[in-house]
Amino acid sequence: MARIAGVDLPREKRVEIGLTYIFGIGRTLSNEILRKTGINPDTRVKDLTDEEISKLREVIDKEYKVEGDLRREIALNIKRLMEIGCYRGRRHRAGLPVRGQRTKTNARTRKGPKKTVGVQRKK
């Protein structure tokens, strides 16, 4: 089984798809990496030679931020936004949508389950 950037690639899938199991690599980046290494995208992961796997590993490690490094960078970017107190940072801190979506209705993913407000009646 090919292990690249700490991720086991699925053996039965094509390399083009298998690489997308690595956080930070999608279809476009996967094709770009395969073009640089000269590996046929239709090759199955199980059919890759050790030389090809080492080529892939080398290119990914040198040129791209993936997995833990990328996650850390994203977390630090969000933390920085929250520290400087900009609009986006305040939205992150409040757990509300950051990119201008409406919040009067919807936004349940960011806001969590509904909190119903009870009405008190006079006795």
UniProtKB/Swiss-Prot annotation:
UniProt-recorded Gene Ontology molecular function terms: rRNA binding; structural constituent of ribosome; tRNA binding
Keyword annotations: Ribonucleoprotein, Ribosomal protein, RNA-binding, rRNA-binding, tRNA-binding
Species the sequence originates in: Acetivibrio thermocellus (strain ATCC 27405 / DSM 1237 / JCM 9322 / NBRC 103400 / NCIMB 10682 / NRRL B-4536 / VPI 7372)
Family: Belongs to the universal ribosomal protein uS13 family.
Transmembrane segments: none
Bias (Basic residues) ranges: 101-123
PROSITE patterns xref list: RIBOSOMAL_S13_1, RIBOSOMAL_S13_2
Lineage start: Bacteria, Bacillati, Bacillota, Clostridia, Eubacteriales
Presence of keyword Glycoprotein: no
Family annotation (Pfam families): Ribosomal_S13 (PF00416)
Disordered: annotated span: 94-123
Entry keyword annotation includes Hydrolase: no
GO CC, alphabetical: cytosol; small ribosomal subunit
GO terms for biological process, alphabetical: translation
Purpose: Located at the top of the head of the 30S subunit, it contacts several helices of the 16S rRNA. In the 70S ribosome it contacts the 23S rRNA (bridge B1a) and protein L5 of the 50S subunit (bridge B1b), connecting the 2 subunits; these bridges are implicated in subunit movement. Contacts the tRNAs in the A and P-sites.
Subunit text: Part of the 30S ribosomal subunit. Forms a loose heterodimer with protein S19. Forms two bridges to the 50S subunit in the 70S ribosome.
SUPFAM superfamilies: S13-like H2TH domain
Gene3D superfamilies named in the record: 1.10.8.50, 30s ribosomal protein s13, domain 2
NCBIfam families: uS13_bact (TIGR03631)
Record-linked HAMAP family: Ribosomal_uS13 (MF_01315)
Protein name: Small ribosomal subunit protein uS13
